[in-house]
């Protein structure tokens, strides 16, 4: 049994960095920078993002994934033999970030939401490829 742990703090930090980058790139920095936020709303978005990741992995790995949220931490337990676990964790974290960023941009800069949704779609496909590939037993 292998476990992937994705932390809210890591994802939220990435969302803040990404919003600052996008804001600077498209000259809407003050509009999209994540300074004031509702913690309960952010945790709900994080739960939605991780549920999205869980659905992708559950469908591909055909195994039950237990997802639990304890003090801002999502733990997914994967009962599968897969040698890409670190890459899967990294991609899952980035996918959760893209999902939350898209939700943030819908509120702050709807004209830029397509950028985040495209990133989310690409990361979903990458996660599918990583989860699907398993090294053959020798």
Predicted segments, located by residue:
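Conserved short "hinge" loops at termini or chain/domain junctions
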Residues: 1-85, 115, 122-138
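Elongated alpha-helical scaffolds
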Residues: 91-103
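Charged, low-complexity interaction regions
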Residues: 104, 108-113
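Short, solvent-exposed helix-helix connector turns and helix-capping sites enriched
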Residues: 109, 117-120
């Amino acid at each position: 049994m292998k476990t992937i742990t994705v932390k809210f703090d890591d994802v939220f930090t990435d969302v803040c960095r990404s919003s600052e980058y996008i804001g600077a790139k498209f000259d809407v920095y003050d509009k999209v920078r994540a300074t004031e936020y509702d913690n309960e709303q952010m945790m709900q978005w994080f739960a939605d993002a991780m549920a999205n990741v869980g659905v992708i992995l559950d469908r591909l790995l055909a195994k039950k994934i237990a997802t639990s949220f304890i003090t801002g931490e999502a733990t997914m337990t994967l009962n599968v033999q897969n040698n890409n676990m670190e890459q899967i964790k990294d991609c899952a974290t980035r996918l959760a970030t893209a999902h939350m960023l898209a939700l943030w941009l819908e509120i702050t800069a709807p004209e830029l939401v397509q950028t985040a949704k495209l990133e989310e779609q690409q990361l979903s496909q990458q996660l599918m490829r990583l989860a699907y590939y398993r090294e053959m037993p020798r």
